[in-house]
């Protein structure tokens, strides 16, 4: 690309208008002559040229673009091919006017620089909008040589050669164009002349073009004209010669002149307003030709050769100039470095001169400071560096270790035989075989008793407590020094051998260095003592100073070296290998300590068991436990139940007689009440005796169920102490609970002043055992946690003798389930938190025992005193899956988790989902729920406490990672520090009185229609 480039510092500092350029004269007349300068060549017959009269206009355009384009916005969207834009030319980074010929991709376009004719592919970021005053016709015109066309089938190489040849004839030269015609796209057909040379004829002579046939004329040439876009792309792929790619452009602002008919080169530089304006050195001054002179093709070639030589010389000059500047910079840097070295050398010389004056004093002071430090270090115990404490610890372990005990081995052997004998008795079902096993067990028992006695006596003589205290102190001391031990260390003997070898080597090295230090210091002291004679003027005997003084420098050097070596060994941190050896040994020592501690703990535990065994066996040896007391209780119960039945019949007869006495009936009622209390008192005594026998059976006498099948001990044990054979329904004063009996028989009664419910379960031979087993599992889980279980306790389980019904007795809390509480007086947010924390505790108790509730809903969750939440029991005749298959609803919200709806088995996660829905129902009161397509409620629609909302989201949306224990520890359930829940005494009294009233007056109250379909205690 040639022509005027942008001037970074042009004098034009204001906007420029272009009168006369807005509408260019496109009217051409036949044989009209124009003087133009070639700017770009497309092929052997087509080129672009600028009118020589537009020189100043090109300069103005460049100045304006240099001011406008850097601040303009890059184009976006679809580009208008008719619109003029500003384009950043890649070779000189200057702005020129251009039009978009083709969009190559989303971020690249093919453009033509309209004032020069050349093309380029630009990024969109290099194309900008320009103002309307720059939107006028192009300076350059497209010309086509008259009467010529590109031969059909021309090869690429010949095409490029023709393009290059035409460029050598017209590029940056002033030529005359005789206009013959104009195409519709604006291409001017003209005859080109350079002096006396007909450029078209020269091109045709070279064979790069052929003359059009006379019959076709302009139309034939038009038909041969290639697609301009294809020419543009081909021009990009085959760039024009060197003159088409120069970074400097020829300008027409330079004056023209003649020097004896020869061409002149414009090499002058101009400045304007203090800024550097560059004019080309190599461009030929257009218009310097005498059009009447004889110019030959040889002259043109000579000019071209001069241009190429000039370009080459210019390049060499620039390289030499750059080398010169680089060498000049290097010389300056070397001079600076030399000056810095001189300064540093002078400073060092001054420092040495000043230090030499005090060299001896400074050296002795430093040595004295090091010796003083060495004294302190020698007083400090540095045994840790050589593992002396580990050696001492291993000596302690070896001297008084307890690693084995002969009596313990014998005891464990006999105890194992004893346990096997007990297991055989426990699994025996035949009484005769059982007697044989009992006799064998008793023999082993005698041997065990003797072994226990020997073991106890031997352990009593051992100082176990003292040894354990020594080991604990030793471990604490080592851990304070070495920290955490390595895990997984093996091959203790190899580790200890390496440690002893390393320790010996280090001790020898340290002893050698220490002796060298002491010897060098003694040598220095001896020198000071001997040198006193040399400097003592009172001595008359002649002394040779050279012999007495000796080489003090060598003595000082030796002393300093030895002292520094010992300091380095004492102070510098140990190496990786040393640390590895010490830590491995420490780990082995600690393992031995813990191993012996574990052995002593085993001894003490076995000693405790042996003492207990000996104590109990002294009372039980060769003597079976007595069940007579249990049988007497059963006999007493039998009599009391007979009296109670008789009194019930007597009361019934009196009530049915016509002349019954009310006083006598009341007296009988009191007697019945006393008899019932006596019956339950004896039942509780019976349970206590069963519990004692159960404990003896578990520990010492597994034969009790086999020897005394009549007492039913095995059934009691299998039920976890819940089953009783002494209780019958007709002994209780019951009232039917019809409103709660939609699913099973349900009656209310009172035991020892406490209202209870009797739940009836229809059972047969197959289901009876499963009901007992499920109830026993629930009862055991409740018993493990005791008062903190969060579960509704089970009081008794008994079987009806006349009907296939199993009755379960549980406490009765009238109107305490969540359904009734929310219907009468809804819980506040604080009360709901207390209640749901208790419910979470109940679920945690069940889940810890691997029990899935599967039937959690508002009718079997209770709010006692509106602050204690407990989880009710469930239907023990049903499995987990059967219980979970019932779709309970609360407030229009299903408590069935999404996984249960898809047929998956119930799990702790499904219990937590029901819990979360109940918690949400309590938190939002009567607000309506929005659910997604799976029926899961949307929690975000409600305004809740942040901690409560976080817990609900975890329960409802992310249950797979939640447990009941995590729910218990949720932020919303944690009380602020120093704050407790008050329980006033008056409130307790009121609660007790209300319970008494409810047990008598409200047991037959009807629930509302909302609770009629559920159960208070399912």
UniProtKB/Swiss-Prot annotation:
Keyword ATP-binding appears in the UniProt entry: yes
Residue ranges, annotated region (Disordered): 988-1018
Residues reported to bind ATP: 717-725, 738
Coiled coil: 298-358
A GO MF label: ATP binding
InterPro entries: Kinase-like_dom_sf, Prot_kinase_dom, Ser/Thr_kinase-like, SNase_OB-fold_sf, Tudor, Tudor_TDRD8
GO CC annotations, alphabetized: acrosomal vesicle; cytoplasm
Keywords linked to the UniProt accession: ATP-binding, Coiled coil, Kinase, Nucleotide-binding, Serine/threonine-protein kinase, Transferase
PROSITE patterns: PROTEIN_KINASE_DOM (PS50011), TUDOR (PS50304)
Reaction catalysis annotation: L-seryl-[protein] + ATP = O-phospho-L-seryl-[protein] + ADP + H(+); L-threonyl-[protein] + ATP = O-phospho-L-threonyl-[protein] + ADP + H(+)
Originating species: Mus musculus
This protein's encoding gene: Stk31
UniProt-listed Pfam families: Pkinase, TUDOR
UniProt-recorded name of the protein: Serine/threonine-protein kinase 31
Family in the record: Belongs to the protein kinase superfamily. Ser/Thr protein kinase family.
EC number(s) from the headed UniProt entry: 2.7.11.1
